[in-house]
C-alpha cells in the first residue's frame, strides 16, 4: 500500500507546528504563576498533539519514499490540494490574529487550544481519507499503466515482425539491385565499346573532314577569284544601270500596259470559257436529242414488229382462205369436167344458165358454189376492213387507194340484184384476183408506214447533222480564239522577260524595284493561272472534239444505214410495182385466152406470200 503524498504531509506538519508555536507563545505570556495541575494538563495536551504530529510526520516520512514516477498523480488532484491549502492559510491567519488579540485569560486560551486541537484532529482525519483516496487512484493508474504496457508490448511484437519483413524485403531489394548493377555494368561495358568504336569513327570522320576542309579552302580560293570577276561584272552592270536608268519609267509604263493586256486576255479567256460552256450545253442537248431519236427508232421498230405480227395473222387467214379456194376450185373443175367435158373454162360455166351450173335438179344451189361464194365474201370483207384501216392511219399511196376504189366500184356494180339484195356474179379467177388484191393491199400499207417512218428519221438525222455542223464550227472558232490568245500570251511573256531583265539591272532604286518585283510576281501568278486554265480549256476542247467526232461518226453510220434501208425499200417497191403490172397483164391475158388450172393462182399467191416474208425478214 502506497503512502500519502508529501504535499499533504507538509501541510499537516505546518498546521501542527503552527499550533505548537501558538501554545508556546501562550505559555510564555501566562508565565510561571499557573498551577501544577494546569501545567500537567498543558504538558499532556502538547504531548498528545506532538504525538499526533509525529504520526503525521511519520506518514509524511513514509510518503517521502514514493518514486518520482508518481509525479503525474499531482496533476490529477492539484485543484483539490489548492483548495485545502487555501483553507489552512485562512486558519493560520485566524490563529495569528487571535494570538495578537488574545485575552489574558488562561482558561479561555486553554479552551481555545483544545478547540484547535480538535480541529487539527479533524483535519488529520480528512487528510488520511484523502490519502486513501489518492492510493486508490494510484492503483487504478497502475492498472492502466500495465494495460498500456501490454499494448506497447504487442505493438513492439508487431513492429518486430514488420522489421523482419522489411529486412527480408531489403535483402531481396539488395539482390535485385545487385543484379541491376551487374546488368548496368554489362551495359556500361557495351557503351564503352560503342564509345571506343565511335571515337574511332570520329577520328576517321575528322580525317575526312580535314580533307574536305582542305578541298573547301581550295574552292574558297577559287570562289574568291570568281568573286573578283563578279565584282568586275557588277561594276560593269552598274555602269549599264546608270546608262539605262533613264528608260526605267518607260519599262514601268510597259508593265502597266502588260497588266492591261493581261486583264484583256483574262476577259477574253472568260468569254471563251462561257462560249465553251454554251458549246458543252449544246453538245448535251444534241446527245439528249440523239437519245430521243434512238428511243423513237426503237419505238418505230416495235411498232413495225407489231404490224408484222398483224400481217402474219392476216397472211395465215389468207392462206387458210386460199386453201379453201383451191379445194373449191378443184371441186368446181371436177363438176364442170363431168357435166361438160368439152369445156374447161370456169368463166364459161359461170356465164351459163343458173339452172345448169349453180343449181341442182331439185332447184337448190350447188354446195361447191355456195362455199366458193362464202370464201369470196370473206376475202372481200377483209379487203374492205384493211382499206378502212389504211384510210384511218394515213393518206399515203393515193394511187393504190384509187385503184382499190375503182375495183370496188366495178365489183359493187355487179353485186346488186333487181330486188336490192346482194347477189354475187361469181366467175373464174375472182378468188385469185381477190387474194392478189389482199396481198398488194397489205404490202402497200406496210410500205406507206415504212416510208413515213423513213421520212421522219431522215428529217431527224438531217436536223442533228445541222446541229453537229454548227457546234463543230463553234469549236473551230473557239480554237482559233485560243490560238490568238496563245500568241498574245507569248508576246506578253517576251515583254515580261525583257522588263525583268531591265529591272534586274536597276540596283539603286530599291523601292521601285521592289514594287516592280511585286507586280512581276503578280503577273507571273496570273500568267500561270491563265496557262493552267488555257491548258484545261484545251483538254476540254479536245474532249469535246473527240466526243463530237464520235457522234458525227455515229450519225454518218446511221445515215448510211438509213440510205441503205431507203434503197432497199425503193427496190422492194419497184419489185412490187413490177409484180403488180405483171399480174395485171396475166389477169388480162387469162380473161382473153383459155383458162389456166386453179392451182396456178394458188402458186402465184404462195410466191407472193414468201416474197413478203422475205421482205419482213429483211426489215428485222
Swiss-Prot record:
One of its GO terms (biological process) is chaeta development. Disruption phenotype: Viable and fertile. Post eclosion discolored, short and brittle posterior scutellar bristle macrochaetae; this phenotype is more common in females than in males. Pupal to adult lethal when combined with mutations in BicD. GO terms for cellular component: cytosol. Residues 23-41 have a biased composition (Low complexity). Residues 493-503, 509-528 have a biased composition (Basic and acidic residues). Residues 120-331, 461-575 form a coiled coil. One of its GO terms (molecular function) is cargo adaptor activity. The keyword Transcription does not apply. Residues 23-53, 493-528 are annotated as: Disordered. Keywords: Coiled coil. PANTHER family: BICAUDAL D-RELATED PROTEIN HOMOLOG, BICD FAMILY-LIKE CARGO ADAPTER. Belongs to the BICDR family. Functions redundantly with BicD. Involved in formation and/or development of mechanosensory organs during metamorphosis. During macrochaetae development, together with BicD, involved in Rab 6 and Spn-F stability and distribution and actin cytoskeleton organization. May homodimerize but does not interact with BicD. May interact with eEF1gamma; The interaction is probably indirect. This is Bicaudal D-related protein homolog.
